[in-house]
Amino acid sequence: MKLEQRIFFLICLVINSFSNCSLLVAPDGYYNIYRENKIENILNLKPNGNKSQDSYYPDVCSKAVKNKEGVKSFILSSFPLSTKEYANVIVTKGSHMTLGDGEYHQIFNINRFLNIVCVEGSLVFSTKDVVYMSALVILPGGNFECIDCTIKFRDLYPTNSLIDPFGFLPGIITLGGSLSLLGKQKTVYSAVLIDENILEVQDISSLDIFNGYSLFIFSESFPLGKASTFTFNSNQIKVLEIKIPKTDKSIRVFFYSRFSTFSTSTTASIHITGNSNVHIENFYIDSFGRTTNDQYSDTELIFSQDDPNLITGFINGSNQRFRSSLYIEHSNNVTIKNSVILENRGETRSPLIFFGSNVNISGNIISSKSGSSLIAQYGTENIQSTNNYYSLSLPLLKSLNSTLDSMDYGNEGNGIFSISPKINSINDIFNGQIIAINHIILSDRSSITGFDKDCYSPCYNDSIRVSSKVQHSVEFKITGSTFISSSNYSESSFLFRISETGSKQSSFYKIINSNLSYPISVLLENNAFILDNVYGFGNFTINGLIKRLDIINSTLDPSVTSSISLSNFSKAISIQNSFMDYRSFQKQNNQIYGSIITPYLYYFENTMNLIKVSKMYPNVNHQILAGTVLNMGIEIIIIAPLFGKMDCIFEDESGIQTIPFNKSSNSCVLPYLFKNEGSFNVRVTLSLTKSLDNIIFQVYFPMVTVFNIYSFYSGWAMIDSNIEKEIIIDGNIFKKGCQQQVLGNCTISTNSKLITGLPSVTESDKLNRLFSSGITSINPYEPVTITIPIDKESKKNQIQLFFTHQPIDIETSLLSIYVENQPIFLLEPLQSNLDSTFKNLTFHYENSKSLEKIKITFITRGDIYLTSTAIYSSTNQPIYNEVIGINEQLNILAIVLPITISLFAAASILAGYLVIKKYKKPNMYYNRNTNGNIGMKVFSTKFKRRPKKVIPLSIPLSTNRITKKSLQSLDSMAENPVILLSIPELEKANEPEFNPEKTFLQESELLDLPTPKVEPEEPRINIVPLPRFPTVYKKEDNDKLLKELNITGPITSENIESFFEVDVGLPSLIIKNESEIILQEIDYIETGEIQEMEGSFLEDKSTDTTVIVTKSDGLPKFFQTKVFSKRFNDISKFDNDFFDLKEYIVEHQEESFEIPFMTSEDEVDETKINIIDFLLSPKSNKVALNMYLKSFQNRNHKLCYGKYGSNKNSILVIEGTSYYYDCTDVRLPISTPRSNLNFGITDGNKCIVDRKYRERLQYINVYSEPFRIYTLFPDSNDNVTITTSECCKEIDPFGSLDVDIFVTLKTTTKFNEKVTIRYETDDKELAFSTFVYLNLESQVSSKIDFDEIVLEKYLSEGSFGVVYSAIWRSSSVAVKLFKHHYSKDEIDKETSILSKIKHPNIVSFIGSLNFLNTYGIVIDYHPRGSLNYYTRNQNIKLSMVQNIRISLDISRACSFLHKNGIIHRDLKPDNVLIVSFDPDSSICAKISDFGTCREINGKHELNSKAGTTRYMSPEILEGLPYTYSTDVYSFAILFFELLSGRVPFREIPKREIPRFVRLGTRPRLDQDVFADNDISLILLACWNPNPRGRPTFDTLIDLLEKLLKKYKERAKRNKKNQNQ
């Protein structure tokens, strides 16, 4: 084969396995072109239309000269070259060539003619001499490394007459190999301006600055960088040629050398595709990029009409897209770190473009004169940008005459332009842009990209019930990033702009955990926008138009509050637990009923430094009967002492009531009597006097709607009128007969569909019948309208709408409701976590026009079904309808009380002296959550009054209108009156102020209303009889046994037990000894009814019985001899490795290995010899980690080699058969249509952890005699549970058999396993075997597969267990394995706390694991280790600035914990991890070890001692409960140790420390460092013996920030004095 043919063959067949790759013959003078349909194959998408998906590359390597075989050096003599002036060379596959420093004189000759370098093998440049070339092409499998090397690109030699029509060259093309550009030293640094030509730069002592370096400065005044010479003294640099304006605050410097550089003297580009590996670090890419900021104009091909592979001409484009400094597509293994990309040759589109690649870049300078600093094209779903400096000099901005189809974006002057990813920007600097982050939503991209199902983020399969393209909600995180907008632009600039393209699909878009000081623009006319945990200050404001705005857990400064006119751009607003300025806040008038306006309004800017509102009740919209008392109140946190008396002034439309503030409970509660019907807006004002002149806070309560008793007027059930009967509940008739017609009492719009057989969502059969059918839209997001009669005589009506949510996926589904075209609820979120749930929406309707019928419209994506409606009239007597008979008795439909979903907690009807005691808190429904439901199922609760608890008689009550019948449950015939509730299970994540276990209402004011949870129905148990067998068999009875059990071959120790375990028709066998076999007497097995699961065969609703396939708990004793263990475990190399280890231990007992094992060589208990026993004793078992690593590949053959696993006993099933690899082989007697089973998960989707999936395996007997089928499934284990309906079955001649397989993946894992199948006739003359392959991969979850963990290094050991560093899915992590004495509850507590808290100064929780009954957690790994190492190591001395900064980070972490109701309880240097010693870095320290942490609630006091005695507070040593002040004391001891370098209480015996601390002893402040009053006062305050006298961590943060600033300034002065 010719070389060019071989190269083309590789390109077409190796690069990404392209199926449609062909060589196109170009006209003379041009390179031939190869064409590939890469996108369809890589993205697993199918074309949807006539759009071309082809990409073209020049065939530049086909005539390259290959190297001589076996040569190592990339020099002239390594290639059979003539004395040409230019040459194209190729490093062939298998060759490893280098270019080093000592080969310069030979390189010089090559430089004169080196043109194109192709790499198919390996090529490493480590020379410090400049290498000139025109093009570098890395072919599939090729590897190119440039280590501290410099390459300069120039035009292709003119003597080479061939032209690249697509403009790739000069430059680099990487087509599926590996590209590494590495500099040995960091050259990018942050700088602080000391004077106009003096810069302070930290941590540059290791950089040999005078060794050929020049200085580039990037700042507000120099967006494209400014070069200068400099002088250097310590960490200060004096700039000689330029002066830096004092207004420049964000400065980066780059020390440029001629090493580690790619530069070009012409227009060039770097193009990376084909799933290439890219690592660019400490490198400089200079002057690349040729795509301008004008409209794209791509080169087009003209093909011959006779030959589709013949190009007859070109239409040359003037501006080929994606020829940038760095273009990366379909390559997810990309690292770009601490590098500089400078694109200043002209006005370009963008220096950095990603296409179908997830992005993680950090510490870079990206500078250009372009339309955007970074562009993320479709397929790039996530951007993680950290500490990057995006610097832009605005080009001449032009409007593009382009459409969406052209995908011509990003020319507007952006920092990051994105059309699809989720963006996380941390500590980035955007300098000179008009828009820092510009995000355009293309919710359905199919019409643009030409791909089927190309919707935003991964598309899910269409539901059985709903055909819909599904979107994820979208999250943006902007934390600590700075935006310096262009001063040369007159129009508005935005930190963030998000807009949609007119899609009718509604979704959530969120900015979370961000500090925003710049304007944002939001154009989401059909969507909801959420600010979650956002601090808005400075110039922050919101412009645009949205349908719904939610402000959650956020704080807005006064200037921000005044600039946000809420009612101008949002139709519905929800403000929860958020602080806004009173004088600037404008309450929305005529709010939509579903909105919640509950801001905490502060009066002065420093208010929140003194006092904060912690909670309020009610905290959701409330509905209540007239004449009922409702306890309304707030609770606050006092941060600093307040002088004078404080009052709580409650007021509404009817008047004002004032009560004194209760200092003991830090609350004020008012029993509020609502006498009249209507809607009431109550607010409470906290004032230092009874006057409103000294207001501190003002809080609006949610709307309280008061109504009189209503009569049931009409009810309608969405049921099939031809089959179902009308439904009567408590005498109230729910009529059938709603039809798609114009006339009639109840009509439905024609764009709806009726779905029957909805799953049960309540405990009541009656109610389930009412909710068993429902209507929804045929097409997603189309409004469905139902017209129903209403009492025209009643002005006030109450309407109940009952919905069943049958979710498509785990994403939030949105519901909007309109009555007579007026919005009632807008984009209310429903999330059911794949379980069907019941939702009730109840609201008032004012029939002011005396209508006889009303139109109710609802809009969903198609997975929410309206099942029934009920209308209540306020007239004295119900109005009868000529079609429907109405019960005359007063009846409130007690299905549920009025509740608004998702944002509304349940409110019970308060009858007589009933006052609610407990309330649930609203859920952060925006957060994705796999456990909690937004709404619980309906249940009934009997009304029980707490004994001896009464309401004061001074509160008037009204009970005369409530009857026993009106409160009776619809699904209970109990004599006692009951109230039926529907309480949404609303856990409010990230909101510590709402704690359901801690209420501030007084016990004397409460009545108990128990609310039992609904548990899923237990499966029915079927008893299946089995044949009886004799109890004992002797060896001589083996043949008889074999005959009875239809087993071939002798019963041996290798096969007997495991074989029977998987056979449903056989009892379990245990071999007692070598002469007896005992058969357990089992008369039945349990098989549970399995509910219908999602999969390929969901339409089959038959009930299946299953048998759980489980792994054996242990081998019988006969199997436990050393000889057998070796032989038995030959099947399992993993176990074999550890038996080898066991032998090693026996032979080396003098090393005292501390692992449990039997000393007798004749009997070994396998259950006690496993990997955990070794890994949990690493100090005494030196070989443990090595043996673990040795066994890793054997345990993970699927991960390491891509192979399938199988049951270790498969060899026993296959033995003695005719084996066929493919189960669809026509030579087999049993036909199996499919060899690969994917459980209905296709198109690259992944299954959900802990969800059961079903697949059906079908057998068809094509022979005229019966066969018996034995099926051996993989063992269930910690990662997967596999069950099946059949393991052993006979199939009749020409008959068929269906076997259902159920698989549940319990962790984040890949399940690629073989099912072993054996077919045999009764006489055993014909026996065949084959495999069926199971394929399933789970989505990423918090449960981790231990088999994917690669332990690398032992780190530490404690009483809890052992910590290792490890690799998990290419990420460095730390794995904490708990010792066996730790209970699962203790571990679950730590895991629960870690999973809830997300903060930069708290170690990040990645997941938990369970392996061989040993639990562990996985967290992020920080190689610098714990603070304890540095405080106890006398050879290491941290500076004061470093010590204070570390203490500040600890305080920030503890403040966050306390705000979330968590006490750490074990704060000490061991539990502080060091991230960086640079005080100016974003993170210096993180706290860890949450095994002793506890969440505080109102019922349980934390009395149990936890932590380390040396750091325990005196009140804990005295046995008093833990409080937040406990951590403050521990911090003081830690802070002392950090500053002094001494172990606290080192002079006191450890056992005596508690006694001395209780007596008031504290560490001595006798060192110079404590002469600073600012430091000593902090310590004295923090270890105050009175916990109430200790400051909060918020106060400490302020003090430490001031202290840090002081010592930084002192350090600068000292350095300046030293330099002088």
Curated annotation (Swiss-Prot):
Record keywords, A-Z: ATP-binding, Kinase, Membrane, Nucleotide-binding, Serine/threonine-protein kinase, Signal, Transferase, Transmembrane, Transmembrane helix
Entry GO CC: membrane
Location (main, coarse): membrane
Keyword Kinase: yes
CDD domains, per database record: STKc_MAP3K-like (cd13999)
Top enzyme class: transferase
EC number(s) reported in the record: 2.7.11.1
Signal peptide (from-to): 1-19
This protein's record includes keyword DNA repair: no
Membrane topology of this protein: Single-pass type I membrane protein
Localization, UniProt: Membrane
Record Pfam families: PK_Tyr_Ser-Thr (PF07714)
Positions of the catalytic residues: 1466
Positions annotated to bind ATP: 1355-1363, 1376
Reaction it catalyzes: L-seryl-[protein] + ATP = O-phospho-L-seryl-[protein] + ADP + H(+); L-threonyl-[protein] + ATP = O-phospho-L-threonyl-[protein] + ADP + H(+)
Segments forming domain Protein kinase: 1349-1604
Residue ranges annotated as Cytoplasmic topological domain: 913-1620
GO molecular function, one term: ATP binding
Similarity comment: In the N-terminal section; belongs to the GDT family. In the C-terminal section; belongs to the protein kinase superfamily. TKL Ser/Thr protein kinase family.
Protein name (Swiss-Prot/TrEMBL): Probable serine/threonine-protein kinase gdt4
